[in-house]
Structure formats: C-alpha cells, structure tokens
From Swiss-Prot:
Keyword Protease found: yes
Entry's Gene Ontology molecular function annotations: carboxypeptidase activity; serine-type peptidase activity
Family matches, as InterPro entries: Carboxypeptidase_A_C_sf, Class_I_gatase-like, LdcA_N, Peptidase_S66_N, Peptidase_S66C, S66_fam
Protein's organism: Rickettsia prowazekii (strain Madrid E)
One GO-annotated biological process of the protein: proteolysis
UniProt entry keywords in alphabetical sequence: Carboxypeptidase, Hydrolase, Protease, Serine protease
Protein name listed in UniProt: Putative carboxypeptidase RP402
C-alpha cells in the first residue's frame, strides 16, 4: 500500500510539474516539426498529453525512412517543414529535437520563395542549419532556444520555456542574457558592443562553410555553443572558422556551454580569445546544458558593461 501511494504521489508530482511548465504556453498554437532526428512513439504521446499545450504533431511527418537516425525521409521532412512555414495559420513552428539531418533539406529550401508571413521558429543544436537559412535568406528573426521535446526532460530548467512563452506572447520588449564573463583584455574594456546576432551550434556553423547557406558573420555578434566536444576538436573547429576568414569583421563572440566546460575546454577558449582582436565572452546561459536562454537572430542587440563591470547581452524585440 505504501509503495502504491508513493507511486501515485510521483505520478501526481510529475503531472503537476509539467502542467505548471506548460501553463506559460497555454493558447499558443504550435506545429511540431522534425527536420533532424525523430522520437519514439512514447515521446510523441507524452508531448500530446501535456495538459494545456496546443500541439499539432502530424503523424505523416514521423514515418521512418531508410536512415534510422532521421525522423523520416528527406522528402517527408522537407515537405512537413515547408507546410508548417507556408500555411495560413499563426502557429509557432517548433523543432522536436536536434540530432542530425537539417542540413540535408536546405537545398530544397533554397528553391522556395520567401512566404508572405513570418512565423516564430524555435530550436537549437542541429537546427542551427535552419536558423542560418531562415535568418539569412528570408531575413526572419528566429529563436535559438529549447526544442519542444526538452519539456519532458527533468534535467532541463523549465524556466527556458517560461522565457520563450514571454517572447511568444509579446510580454517582453527586451531579452537579456546576464553573466557574460570576458575572456580577453579587449572584452574587459568593452563598455558597449552593438550588432545583430548570428551563430548557434559550432559543429553546424562549421558544416555551413563552403555551402550556399554558409554563415554570414560580418558586422555581427557571433554566439557559439556545442556539447561533448573534445578540447582538441574544439580548437580545430575554431581554427577552421578563423582561417576561413569568417571572423573578419565580427563585432564580438559569445561562447555558451560546451558540455561540462572542463579545464581543458576553458583553456582552449581563453587561448583562442587572446588570439583575436575582438571582445570574446563566456556564459553558461545557453547551450545543451540545464539552462538554455533564448537568443534571437537578426535583432538589434548590444553587449553592455554595468558600472560594476558586469556584462550582459540585450536583445531588442
């Protein structure tokens, strides 16, 4: 009887915590897209059963293709994304999860004309490929933020979704990321840096190099994050960015989390920062770890230093 009651309490607690999280997203119509790796039927069912969420998860978009690490075939994933971006609804287009596969459908996206209506588009990790396309080709202000499946992950800070909900409902005029730590002397003395934002997952940014959707960095504040990256690999990827001349004209760089940010990882980031003549900052407020604050592409943004010499990123909506 004790075990049975304990089980009921656990179920009740889980249900209540999910409901309180989703409460901030109530009445927001959302179309879920899976442009990369998919999810099992239980994950999809659990998402559909979150009280208060208005999710549209088209079953036709989750038919396995030849490659098991993709949600469905390239054709199906492209068609489902296209339909979500172009339909007449006001639905938010929200990525299910990252993984791998978004870059595979960009050649088809490049054939499309820009739709008449801009929609909110949210996701991160592998979804960086789509952010670069949508922000550069269509001029959209997309949101680098938690994928919708993160709602089911207890290790994620559900405040990530509170902040996203505030943006979607128009409750805020500014979005900020605090606790930027300067990594080089130029950053320490920078009281104001202005520029629109671009970037995302470092691996995907590197993947873009040499493609038709290559990242455009000139005059921008570049933000970068990644996960489970060995220090030597991190150094190699950053070196590639630098030697590709993609850091020429960049206003500043903000590094998010890179896994557990081991001492060796921080050594690589600091060493890289001191090799550049631009301000470089570090924060744990976005990326694959517990906290993933939203960052908005193509917004008027600035990094400011307070009178206490603390730094923050401010994005105007």
């Amino acid at each position: 009887m004790v075990l049975k009651n304990l089980s009921l309490l656990i179920i009740l607690f889980f249900s209540t915590s999910v409901f309180s999280v989703s409460n901030n997203l109530i009445n927001i119509p959302i179309t879920v897209v899976a442009t990369a790796t998919g999810a099992d039927s239980k994950t999809l069912s659990d998402l559909k059963n979150i009280n208060g969420l208005n999710l549209q998860i088209p079953a036709k978009c989750f038919t396995k293709g030849k490659l098991p690490f993709l949600a469905s075939s390239d054709e199906v994933r492209f068609n489902c994304l296209r339909d979500a971006l172009f339909d007449k609804s006001d639905n938010v287009v929200w990525s299910l999860r990252g993984g791998y596969g978004s870059a595979r459908i960009i050649p088809d996206l490049l054939k499309l004309s820009k739709p008449n209506k801009e929609k909110f588009f949210i996701g991160y990790s592998d979804i960086t490929a789509l952010h670069l396309f949508l922000s550069q080709e269509w001029g959209w202000r997309t949101i680098h933020g938690s994928n919708i499946a993160d709602l089911l992950k207890t290790e994620k800070d559900q405040g990530n979704f509170t902040k996203l909900g505030e943006i979607l409902k128009g409750k805020v005029k500014q979005v900020t990321i605090d606790n930027l730590i300067p990594l080089n002397d130029i950053a320490k003395s920078s009281d104001l840096v202005k520029g629109n934002l671009t970037g995302g997952n470092l691996t995907m940014v590197q993947t873009s190099i040499g493609t038709r959707w290559q990242i455009k960095t000139k005059g921008k504040i570049l933000f970068l994050e990644d996960t489970n990256v060995a220090p030597f690999r991190l150094d190699r990827e950053l070196l590639h960015l630098k030697q590709s001349m993609l850091l020429e004209g960049v206003k500043a760089i903000i590094f998010g989390s890179f896994g557990k940010d081991l001492d060796a990882t921080m050594l690589v980031l600091r060493n890289f920062a001191y090799s550049l003549n631009i301000p470089v900052f570090k924060t744990n407020r976005f990326g694959h770890e517990r906290i993933n604050d939203p960052i908005i592409y193509n917004t008027n943004s600035k990094i400011i230093m307070s009178k206490h010499k603390e730094f923050k990123l401010i994005m105007e909506l």
